[in-house]
Amino acid sequence: MKILVLNCGSSSIKYKLFDMTTKEVIAQGGIEKIGLKGSFLKLTLPNGEKKVLEKDIPEHTIGVEFILNTLINPEYGAIKSLDEINAVGHRMVHGGERFSESVLLNKEVLEAFTACNDLAPLHNPANLKGVNAVSAILPNIPQIGVFDTAFHQTMPDYAYMYAIPYEMYEKYGVRLSLIH
């Protein structure tokens, strides 16, 4: 079983491809400067050699597509076919209070996650672009969301409440989340 993990940031995408039978990372890398001049993919080949591939990457969808194509590239890839990928995991930044554990991404989950965009305006939209790009290229692959905010959902209220009017917490969900 092979699992691809993506971390889509505001101007970057990091990835690792895990072979769960051997419990090894078989491919890893990252795209930097998405939407800027001089964007590139830095990757580590299965033999440990590091490479930099320069490419104009104007947005995340093209970045995810470039990563997937690189994974199956005869010169740089770690797998022969995208069919070898059994699931994709996504680091998702702010899931509000709704997501206290990892979840299978579906329409309802993505709508609820989108509703949290104001809480992480640089990261949540980028996370969604990664999910949508994978859905377009690998429509039958299960995708899992792992939320930064889930790690601290068990804190007592006195530990996560800010000294602000309680109505702001109720209306906007503003609370200590310890992300970043």
Model-derived regions: residue spans:
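Non-transmembrane, aqueous-exposed alpha-helical and coiled segments at domain scale
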Residues: 1, 129-130, 138-140
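Membrane-proximal intracellular helices of multi-pass ion channels
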Residues: 2, 72, 154-160, 167-177
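Short glycine-rich, Thr/Ser-proximal phosphate-binding strand/loop in the N-terminal lobe
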Residues: 3, 12-58
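Short glycine-aspartate micro-motif
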Residues: 3-5, 87-89, 144
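Conserved active-site "lid/cap" helical segment
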Residues: 37-86, 116, 130
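Short beta-strand-loop/turn "lid" adjacent to the catalytic site in phosphate-handling enzymes
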Residues: 77-123, 151-159
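Conserved small/polar residues in nucleotide/adenosyl-binding loops
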Residues: 180
